[in-house]
């Protein structure tokens, strides 16, 4: 949702605001090559990098309040020098609210706890505690890796307790009661607090939110064990969302870095994050991210399951995977990528590909299928998996394990065979009232992008589409945030509901904090461009505000309205750093004499002097007379020249 107001206008919703940020403070982590945003550092556990806090430059926190004053939806309000404000969708959570003291050791406030408890259809499972860092055993969650630590060990001394030392008991559905999923509620005609929150946030009627979820065209990922998250919806009828991937690897990164990446990604606009950790301390890293995440968190459980069996795909089993999924459900993972469509008979279809199987999860399960010459255990146990997801309201993100990894492989037989199977599994999940979205490619040339969306809608019954890019060319390592943002904008316009970001490090290495920002900004541009093309209500208000500021040479407002205010200001100040340049009617591109907008103002002033409006029509009777007199003058010139249409060229 984007709205524009002025100081004299009245609003139908109450709003509470905090002070705008006017200074540029140092960020939590050093970034020598990129100017940081106006952020400060929060208090953190000993030895842990502080996370970024504070409002974006020129912005302040505001809240939309509906009929129920207890329901407050956070937004970002950009304050302009004219006294107007522009209110935009905000994913940053409490980290940009100067009135909140952030301590990552305690996690974020569990805002949804009371909503969940009041429904009375879930209860704490006293047999379980969260999290554990040692080997798994009855009643204890953990990575299950021998030697990975014991309760109380690890870099931050956690194990079997919540981040602030309290034992946390996970919730699950009360047996015998109706479905506790947002899909179940929506189908029964019940409007939840989460749906009300989304309606305010998107600027849509709450009945639209309920109906889209009930039809399976949208998902509202909201695990009952992640009460810290701020509800959001993913679907064609809503703003296009973006996801940012995080997570360590066996080679690099740490828990501290991944928590800061999560905060940094949501600061710049990530609607969800996925923890794709494959290195050490997978469970502990995930716990820290979830407890501090204001957005839904997704995972790929097969990664942790593989770690439990020593990294050997052939040693995997349904039992190991099932226990891993339950552990992650109890921690609060909101959606999980499940590669249940990688069937044994589809694996040979990839043999003639230029780049084979490029999905990590897809390759792991293909390897298992070939090692045992059995059908994928995620496919054969899918109904049981649905029952587990339904107990916690976890959303399926049905993985495209056979997605194309190169332009040459786009829309091939393997990709489309798996897509048809995902459509089959979608209906199975819906029978269990489990929410579903479908993952898509990948690497797709522009001429095949719309076809991908049409096939997905047809084969997967209009379930929301969630795509990685797609990259529209393979020739630009180091710039794949650009090659993929092109495809992302196009596929978002065609109907994709969420775009998984790609960073400049794609295909090259693990992204750092700067890469995360570059990827998020690129994808926010793509998503917003798609919203504009779709004609989403209110999407253009932000563009119009910036266009006005640009035409009126309000430089400070241009900076503040930018997706990245600090970079916009830094680029301007590289050549015109003086304070006087902030009121100049030109920039260093055209200089004082060739600025098209300055000349346009002069043309308007001249037209206005003749009583004309900017379009050249009479703004008043005197203006009409000026137009008539001008036409008569030109007619007289034509007659004086002998009524000739073509005149000889004059010699110089």
Curated annotation (Swiss-Prot):
Residues where Zn(2+) binds: 443, 507
Residues annotated as signal peptide: none
Pathway info: Cofactor biosynthesis; thiamine diphosphate biosynthesis
Comp. bias regions, Low complexity: 8-45
Binding site for substrate: 245, 274, 303, 339, 359-361, 400-403, 439, 466
Cellular component annotations (GO), alphabetically ordered: cytosol
The reaction(s) this protein catalyses: 5-amino-1-(5-phospho-beta-D-ribosyl)imidazole + S-adenosyl-L-methionine = 4-amino-2-methyl-5-(phosphooxymethyl)pyrimidine + CO + 5'-deoxyadenosine + formate + L-methionine + 3 H(+)
Entry EC no(s): 4.1.99.17
Binding site for [4Fe-4S] cluster: 587, 590, 595
Pfam families recorded: ThiC-associated, ThiC_Rad_SAM
Cofactor: [4Fe-4S] cluster
Highest taxon, organism lineage: Bacteria
One biological process term in Gene Ontology: thiamine biosynthetic process
GO MF annotation, one: 4 iron, 4 sulfur cluster binding
Alphabetical UniProt keywords: 4Fe-4S, Iron, Iron-sulfur, Lyase, Metal-binding, S-adenosyl-L-methionine, Thiamine biosynthesis, Zinc
Compositionally biased residues, Gly residues: 134-162
Cofactor note: Binds 1 [4Fe-4S] cluster per subunit. The cluster is coordinated with 3 cysteines and an exchangeable S-adenosyl-L-methionine.
Segments of this protein annotated with the region Disordered: 1-45, 118-166
Similarity comment: Belongs to the ThiC family.
Function of the molecule: Catalyzes the synthesis of the hydroxymethylpyrimidine phosphate (HMP-P) moiety of thiamine from aminoimidazole ribotide (AIR) in a radical S-adenosyl-L-methionine (SAM)-dependent reaction.
Name of the protein: Phosphomethylpyrimidine synthase
Organism, as annotated: Frankia casuarinae (strain DSM 45818 / CECT 9043 / HFP020203 / CcI3)
